[in-house]
């Protein structure tokens, strides 16, 4: 490989940066140019890499994160100095919390100007260090390839996340001597030690009420395949965080207690409280706080690529650290009988199944207008088939969807819980579509979150992205409102005015739809799904039942 990339003289450091990106297999770069980084944009014109101009830097990071989550290879954002970098912060923090590999390259003032009060001077490394896995400035031109290569390694290995590289203007504009480094990828790990796997197999054999708790890393495709074999072998009940959506397939659906998160009141939560053995697979505490679900009465097993980050409510008794898929496959081989459910666990799963069937039969009969959230979820279930990718923003709708809409393909759903960032869904959808243009992407937001990234409709139209965006309209920040009402019995700062979302979408060149009656919901969604290109559907929603989400909600109370 060294002979393939000899040391050579580059007219500009930017040329070496771009060649290093090509060596990493980068297919597109999301960003906004500026004077401190425009030489890199110029060099990209002579490369195989596609430039995707965006309308806000945070959205560049969101789009790159979608590429990273779906492919496992870091997506790339490219921004200028000063506010170009500071605008990027939310996207990078979100990617880091959600485990999405992203590499961001940010322009910076010339090295000689770092200590001066000059235009757009900012200590971006200090700014990004707390919210990334890796943040560094290139201080010597001949280190360019090494720094960029290591940024990819940091972003992609272990639990993936974000990495930031600061590129001073004189480093990328000036000549440099160096060579491109071949992409080495993340190092291949082996399974956890055999004796530790044997120990967990014995714990499973002795347990009366074991349960698997799945986290984001369990939904990586190879891990998901191994998990499904383990579920079939063991017949152990399973629950998951929101981020692990799609890890459990339809064959194991009868043992799936649904997703858990935010409020401790789901079937999965009841099984966790009942459990004498909890096996966490690919889980990070940022996905669902251990204090919410860990009773302290169960033996706790941690299976992941990294040791557990311990806290008072998460101190595993056994840790299986290594390649997750390899570990799960070995564990499955060590299990010699299927679990017989305890009467209590069997009843919890039967009740969960009853509620699923109730929603399937009666969800479409909720005829009030504005629409009940379950009516919308039931209609969405019909359009989000296995070929559709779903991206979900943050808001009250996110809880209804996470609890009651089911998907069975690993990484089919992108949902945020680490930072609970508003505005992610539309840029995520654009990034996801670029990875798989043959797949329709459906994104969902509230009317609050939508306007935080709605300018990217122009990007979607320019790219002719086959993206359908659904807006649940209630003229307020409802998820905050229901919590304020519970805590203070009054509302503050959560109401805003209406707008014509159909006209707004059409002003960008997208196809706009507005649901104007309950009976129009399903026909409108079908018509919007038939659009070959960007489309937006505004759906008025009645959130009066949202306080029930924080209690022991049983669907028979509504349906």
UniProtKB/Swiss-Prot annotation:
InterPro entries assigned:
Acetolactate_synth_catblc (IPR012782), DHS-like_NAD/FAD-binding_dom (IPR029035), THDP-binding (IPR029061), Thiamin_PyroP_enz_cen_dom (IPR012000), Thiamin_PyroP_enz_TPP-bd_dom (IPR012001), TPP-bd_CS (IPR000399), TPP_enz (IPR045229), TPP_enzyme_TPP-bd (IPR011766)
Please provide the record's keywords in A-Z order: FAD, Flavoprotein, Magnesium, Metal-binding, Thiamine pyrophosphate, Transferase
Query: Which pathway does this chain act in?
Result: Polyol metabolism; (R,R)-butane-2,3-diol biosynthesis; (R,R)-butane-2,3-diol from pyruvate: step 1/3
Q: How does activity depend on pH?
A: Optimum pH is 6.
What is a biological process (GO) this protein takes part in? isoleucine biosynthetic process
Q: Which residues bind Mg(2+)?
A: 447
Which reactions fall under this protein's catalytic activity?
Answer: 2 pyruvate + H(+) = (2S)-2-acetolactate + CO2
Q: Where does FAD bind?
A: 159, 263-284, 304-323
- GO terms for MF: acetolactate synthase activity; flavin adenine dinucleotide binding; magnesium ion binding; thiamine pyrophosphate binding
Q: Which Pfam families match?
A: TPP_enzyme_C (PF02775), TPP_enzyme_M (PF00205), TPP_enzyme_N (PF02776)
- A GO cellular component entry from the record: acetolactate synthase complex
An additional note in the Swiss-Prot or TrEMBL entry is: Does not seem to require thiamine pyrophosphate. Valine resistant.
This protein is called Acetolactate synthase, catabolic
Biological source species: Klebsiella pneumoniae
